[in-house]
Amino acid sequence: MKIRNLTLALAGTALVFSACEKDPDPKVPADNANIALATILPNPDGMTGAAYLQLIRDEFPQNTNNNNGIPIPYEGAYPVIEGNDIFVFPGYMGDSKNELVKYTRVNGRLSKTGTMKLPPNSSATNIVFASAEKAYLSMAGLGRIAIFNPITMVQKGEIDLSSLGVSDNNPDPSAMLLRDGLLYVGLSQMVGGWVPPQDRPYSDIAIIDTQTDKLLKMITDKTSGISMPTRPIDRYSIFMDEKKDIYISCVGAFGMVKGHNAGILRIKAGETEFDPTYRWTITGADISGEEKTAGFISAIRYVNNGKAYAYINMPGYYKPGEQGHTAIADLAVEINLYDRSMKKIKGLDLSNGFGVMLALYKGTVLIGNSSTKAKGIYSLNIQTGEVSK
């Protein structure tokens, strides 16, 4: 198996396809397993539960269970894959051991091959690899970025961004992207909870020179009304197209603060400022084939030629009393970044927030979905737009 074939998919609420908890059936064969499956099993409150990580074969359809699953922190950010290694984060709220854990694929199974101790309440969420021996780890809870060797799992340094915090000493560094020797870091600027100050519907990006590991500058969009650049747990919420233009998905305080909009901003190739000609507001935007308007992008994955696939959280589908990840209110869409349009993907029901994972694999998009009818992973043909049954 080629290293590039190790792919992450995630299913929420219950196991992919048929299983729904630790299953008494025999272990699922792991030969030729090259898809990493993270499974989330929330309790009714959505704030607690269990999570597992395992490898599965790329045979569809198939049934699986959690007997091969490795317990991982329930509230951790999505695991990050680099080659044959998978990096697992501690719980975002500090409800687990304070460490970054590395697992390596060996003969179709995952083996624990390293750990790196982290400070308490780090809320580590994202890794960017500068080289085989140098990586950056954002710690949203501390306002810092750790520099470490992903081979030895030893920290080598740290970048303190606390001076960029608004109303506190923490700008909440989130998802990151490396382009031309510069590290672009989304700053969520959350204050006293999950949202930024109401009077500041802005988007901030820190830019770091990776040759010196020093802050170059912070850039701010103050005019679009779009806020909270990148979703902390989604490494793909900041990405590049083939032109090397950077696109940033901003979650707009998750729709919880009046005057804050979700949207997409751009930093063009060769530039280190926001592109004033590209400010696409997602909040309230129309979606072709769908009667209700958009809220914010809960997950996104760029494919090519301006095309991306995403889940849009839809406030119009929230039922009384529903909130956050437990609401069945996320709609799968195809996005055209260049003409700023969205269309509904046929063949998928609304999902809760636990199942909204997108992965690229062998010319298809693997889409996690946790609806009222079924919970599993579906394959979408990029060329035809058809979804597996």
What are the functions of these language-model segments?
Residues V185-Y202, I248-G263, A310-I328:
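Short, conserved, GDST-rich strand-edge loop motifs in beta-rich repeat architectures
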Residues N67-N68, G114-P120, I159-N169, L215-I233, ...:
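Surface-exposed loop and turn segments in beta-propeller and other repeat-based domains
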Residues Y52-N149:
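Post-signal peptide N-terminal segment of secreted/secretory-pathway proteins
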Residues P42-G46, Y92-S96, G141-R144, M190-W194, ...:
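Short glycine/acidic-enriched loop and turn motifs that connect beta-strands
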Residues K2-T39:
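Bacterial Sec-dependent N-terminal signal peptides
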Residues A294-S370:
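Loop/turn-rich, solvent-exposed surfaces of beta-rich toroidal or solenoidal domains
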Residues P71-G83, P120-V128, D168-M176, S227-S237, ...:
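Repeated scaffold domains used in trafficking and secretory/extracellular systems
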Residues Y52-L55, K102, N149, Q198-D213, ...:
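Beta-propeller blade signature
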